[in-house]
Amino acid sequence: LTEAERRIAGLVAEGRTNREVAAALFLTEHSVETALTRVYRKLGVTSRAELASHYAAKN
């Protein structure tokens, strides 16, 4: 993952909404959605819950 994708994925894994992530990182919600699509594909996950599980397993 790119640095930006890691930041977005980390905030989503913490339970933040796309709107909250966008506000925290000064991005548009569309940018967050696009990045999450790439993150899901790269990690082979299909949901926010799977993403959170993936991050929990790594830490």
Label each region the model flagged.
Residues L1-T37, R41-N59:
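Helix-turn-helix DNA-binding segment
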